[in-house]
Amino acid sequence: HKSLPDAQVYAPLAHPIETLRLLLTKTPLEHEAIMALRGLANGPVDAQVHAHMAKIFRDPELRPRANQSFHDGHRHTYQRLQHLMRQLPEGIHGFAQPQLLMAVASHAAINDPSLFMGCVIQQGLCIGTLLAFEQDHPHSAQWRHQLETGARLGVYALTEIGRSNSHMGACVEAVFDPQTRTFVLNTPNKAALKFANVGINNLDKMGVVFAQVTVQGQACGVFAFVLPLSDAKGPRPGVCMSSPAEIRAVPLDYGLASFDRVRLPFDAWLCDGASIDAANHFHDPLGSTDRRLIRSLFAPKNVWAMVGIGLSSVMLACATLALTHANRRTTQARIGNGTGLLAFRTQRRALFGCLATAYVMKCFANDSARLWIEGTASQASLQTTGSGDVTWTPWAAISQTLALTKALCAPAAEALATECRLRCGVAGALNLNRFADYEGMAK
């Protein structure tokens, strides 16, 4: 329509990655419709927080490098993660201002999916686990501070390679030794190898390792243990860490870890109200191994909120890139020489459909993030643990809404990024424009 203003160019293809962030920070304020859309994009995060986070992510130290080997790329990702942890405002520590974590998720996802996954593991999983279980624990707050400042890197070791749904019953054992009141952490077979970000094994990494606690021959449930996995000299005694597997979708140093009768002090156990008395009797106030499993897997709800925000931000970025490209580009086809691509119905239907999907998923992810933000104040309470039985997986018992957010956002983001990439022709295939990276992030 002739009365419509010219399309605002947010992020032309082949421009530096920071132009994508203009979607969140530089929309034209004079148009009420644009303001409304900006509010939808910001979601539960204040515009000032987005602006501050955009400034942090403009730091050249956080930019990914091109044409690196897998090993060099993994190391650079961790360097950037540690640099980012040092730059973040104090309010993110202990999730005191939970909207800051959502802002990190949004900007990290657009900046680089590998850095985003590093943030998910470091903040959502490892810091989130320590925060949830640090009440009355002598060292948990100290460990959390080391991760929050980037002094150490977190490894979340839950998945075991040999079985589907391995989180339902960890085979790695933490056997209580009544003589020394310590635990012996052991990987019984190759099926119990942990699959986690352990491939670069000469960095200072701290593991949050999930194991079946066994007391006097009785399986007492899955709990988290915290232990040093590696330092500059390599893996710690009794810890074996494989070289990284090459996963092109989202490059990170995923590999296999095992434990050969590693002796852990009693305080390595994030007991979370459970206890072993002087007579070596195990007690758990939750009363069942199913409830304990749900409780131990508390931190993934942080990840689902982060992933929902991250993927929905990526969807908006993809739609913006593709529409900007189509709006600026003409065709020399005989059917319409000099005609803009958006004049063709097939292009409009595809790209406006992508834009609509992006906004719908963004609204859904924002609502889920609001629920997560509202729930952070009570997240450490034992009373918030679900009481239902675990059947297929424990995720629905942890949070139905947040689990659904991840389940819906991931395939939507993959399909949308693929469609936008195809609609941009050769420009969509350029690594600089990140469509393939965003597809991989959603897989």
Question: Regions from the language model: what does each represent?
Answer:
Residues 182-242:
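A short core secondary-structure module
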Residues 1-142, 146-153, 165, 176, ...:
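Amphipathic, small/basic residue-rich leader segments at the start of a protein or domain
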Residues 125-135, 158-162, 336-340, 401-406:
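Conserved short loop/turn motifs at secondary-structure junctions
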Residues 144-149, 164, 175-177, 198-201, ...:
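A general structural signal for short secondary-structure junctions and capping/turn motifs
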Residues 176-184, 227-443:
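Internal glycine-rich alpha/beta core junctions
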Residues 170-177, 206, 210:
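Long amphipathic alpha-helical scaffold regions
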Residues 155-174:
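A gly/ser-rich beta-alpha-beta helix-loop segment of oxidoreductase catalytic cores
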